[in-house]
Curated annotation (Swiss-Prot):
It comes from the Archaea. It is an enzyme of class 4 (lyase). This is Pyridoxal 5'-phosphate synthase subunit PdxS. It comes from Thermococcus gammatolerans (strain DSM 15229 / JCM 11827 / EJ3). One of its GO terms (biological process) is pyridoxal phosphate biosynthetic process. HAMAP family: PdxS. D-glyceraldehyde 3-phosphate binds at R171. Pathway: Cofactor biosynthesis; pyridoxal 5'-phosphate biosynthesis. The gene is pdxS. The lineage of its organism: Archaea, Methanobacteriati, Methanobacteriota, Thermococci, Thermococcales. Belongs to the PdxS/SNZ family. Catalyzes the formation of pyridoxal 5'-phosphate from ribose 5-phosphate (RBP), glyceraldehyde 3-phosphate (G3P) and ammonia. The ammonia is provided by the PdxT subunit. Can also use ribulose 5-phosphate and dihydroxyacetone phosphate as substrates, resulting from enzyme-catalyzed isomerization of RBP and G3P, respectively.
Length: 335
């Protein structure tokens, strides 16, 4: 079976979300080479994320962060039997098409890389491969799900080893869902209209440049071939589903700042479906032990006595950064 045949089998929304459910309850680790990928697999990771650099090094290097080199991704794909994911820049359709043709298992449209489109994220429904996207709140999550994301994650603040932003994003999302469940359908439609406003940014900017009022026609496309009203209706449908379920309709992982087994357990205690670990493994003093400990912490998140043993003799975690001292906030990228 060729790679394109495999992609074809991933195509429907049901299959895309089904693939995401396969990694539920697990840990996905960032890796930059075959050796790291094998360490992750041996530690029990359910998947790996192939990058050129881990987020801490991306932050340190500065400049423009792009999709990892194809040779690097292929090296990682050849090294492990677990699923391999890879990141593309926000809005970069060409990078996504390349990864789809390469045959990775999932694409992360990621704020960790330098965004390529200041207005829009990729319309993920145009692809057969599943996507995961980050969110800071319910609005961002609903927009990404409407665009076709099969899996969500918190943005956190990648590369810092500081869990505070991931906690913030989980709390904002959960409390907004709780509020949604107390709202009438009419009120929820108003929320959908509010959440759809970012799709108007380009149209409004063009009108401002042209000296025209910031208004769009009822039948005017504002995102691909979708009108503002069509977007509102789509978001409204997802919001009603969230109200009914009491959670997002897709798998939702924690990401951004997970650096210790305790961090991973905290995210699971807060109701997340699993954990992404970026720099926290390979910026620690003993990556194999830290990797295994974080996997075990996710498996035993509600067993404090077990967590005590898991947290022993695992070496030093990565050096963390105070969020208030950051010059660049990766979480603010995207809309």
């Amino acid at each position: 079976m060729g790679k394109l045949d495999i992609i074809e089998k991933k195509g429907t929304e049901r299959l895309k979300r089904g693939f995401a459910k396969m990694v539920k309850g697990g840990v996905i680790m960032d890796v930059t080479n075959a050796e790291q990928a094998r360490i992750a697999e041996e530690a029990g990771a359910v998947a790996v994320m192939a990058l050129h650099r881990v987020p801490a090094d991306i932050r340190k290097a500065g400049g423009v962060a792009r999709m990892a080199p194809i040779e690097k991704i292929q090296e990682i794909m050849d090294a492990v039997t677990i699923p391999v994911m890879a990141k593309v820049r926000i809005g970069h359709v060409a990078e996504a098409r390349i990864l789809e043709a390469l045959g990775v298992d999932m694409i992360d449209e990621s704020e960790v890389l330098t965004p390529s489109d200041p207005y829009f994220h990729i319309d993920k429904r145009e692809f057969k491969i599943p996507f995961v996207c980050g969110n800071r709140n319910l609005g961002e999550a609903v927009r990404r799900i409407w665009e076709g994301a099969a899996m969500m994650r918190t943005k956190g603040e990648a590369g810092t080893g500081n869990i505070i932003e991931a906690v913030r994003h989980v709390r904002l999302l959960k409390d907004n869902i709780a509020l949604l469940q107390r709202m009438t359908d009419e009120q929820i439609y108003g929320v959908a209209e509010k959440f759809a406003e970012p799709y108007l940014r380009l149209a409004f900017e063009v009108r401002e440049i042209s000296g025209l009022p910031k208004q769009v026609l009822e039948n005017e496309p504002v995102y691909g071939h979708y009108t503002y009203r069509e977007i509102v209706e789509g978001l409204y449908k997802i919001l009603l589903e969230i109200k009914k379920l009491g959670r997002l309709p897709v798998v939702n992982f924690a990401a951004g700042g997970v650096a210790t087994p305790a961090d991973a357990a905290l995210m699971m205690q807060m109701g997340m479906d699993g954990v992404f670990v970026g720099s926290g493994i390979f910026k620690s003093s003993n990556p194999p032990k830290m990797a295994r400990a974080i996997v075990e912490a996710v498996n035993h998140w509600d067993e404090p006595d077990v967590l005590v043993e898991i947290s022993k003799e695992i070496g030093e975690p990565m050096r963390g950064q105070d969020i208030e001292e950051l010059e660049v906030r990766l979480e603010e990228r995207g809309v």
